[in-house]
């Protein structure tokens, strides 16, 4: 009925919220631009499907150090059946996939950023390694913060992203520990569990949960959302 122009089937009252709102906002943005029709509700999925391919190319290129391999990854994803279908369907999975891959791409960029800062630290002091010292405390790391925001948006699309957040937060800390060990921190490497672990927890886990909570701003700011008055009732 919707494709024939009858949108009266849409309910005026709020219904059960199965998933968080970010992906639904994006679908609604396409409908706002192009109307409640098959193109309007697919538009955002198409855009994010294309962006997913671009981010994948950049991620694989950064990991492999090869433009060719990055390009091949993009080609393979372009012709992947699931990517093809999800980019043309008004479902949430393509949005969550994009935000998750973006989060991982930012973490990989942070890994490179962190190692470059360690190398610069050694170069400025004209030393070969840390010599058993812990090294610089790099707390504000822009790429890691960007990753936390991306994870938060992924959580704001579907809760499934929580598993990826937990896994990659631990992996990011492991990368830091490995980098300090390679730089010669020696026995002080274990201090990274707290001195790098706490900033990582704040930048990834806490920030992503703050972003996730922020995605519900419209629910908190209005009174007509599903179960909005459950406490009073």
Where in this protein do the model-derived segments appear?
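Membrane-integral, polyisoprenol-dependent glycosyltransferases
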Residues: 1-225
């Amino acid at each position: 009925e919707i494709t024939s122009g009858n949108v009266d089937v849409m309910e005026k009252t709020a219904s059960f919220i199965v998933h968080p709102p970010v992906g639904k906002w994006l679908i609604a943005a396409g409908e706002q631009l192009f109307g409640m029709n098959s193109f309007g509700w697919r538009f955002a999925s198409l855009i994010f499907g294309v962006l997913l391919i671009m981010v994948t190319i950049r991620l694989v290129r950064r990991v492999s150090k090869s433009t060719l391999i990055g390009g091949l990854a993009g080609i393979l994803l372009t012709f992947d059946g699931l990517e093809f279908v999800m980019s043309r369907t008004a479902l949430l999975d393509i949005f969550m996939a994009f935000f998750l891959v973006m989060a991982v791409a930012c973490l990989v960029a942070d890994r490179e950023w962190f190692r470059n800062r360690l190398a610069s630290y050694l170069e400025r002091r004209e030393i070969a390694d840390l010599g058993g010292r812990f090294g610089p405390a790099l707390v504000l790391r822009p790429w890691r913060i960007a990753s936390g925001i991306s994870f938060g948006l992924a959580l704001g699309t579907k809760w499934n992203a929580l598993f990826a957040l937990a896994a990659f937060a631990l992996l990011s800390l492991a990368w830091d520990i490995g980098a300090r060990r390679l730089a010669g921190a020696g026995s002080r490497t274990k201090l990274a569990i707290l001195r790098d672990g706490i900033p990582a927890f704040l930048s990834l886990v806490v920030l992503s949960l703050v972003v996730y909570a922020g995605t519900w701003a419209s629910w908190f700011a209005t009174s007509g959302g599903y179960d909005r008055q459950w406490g009073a009732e």
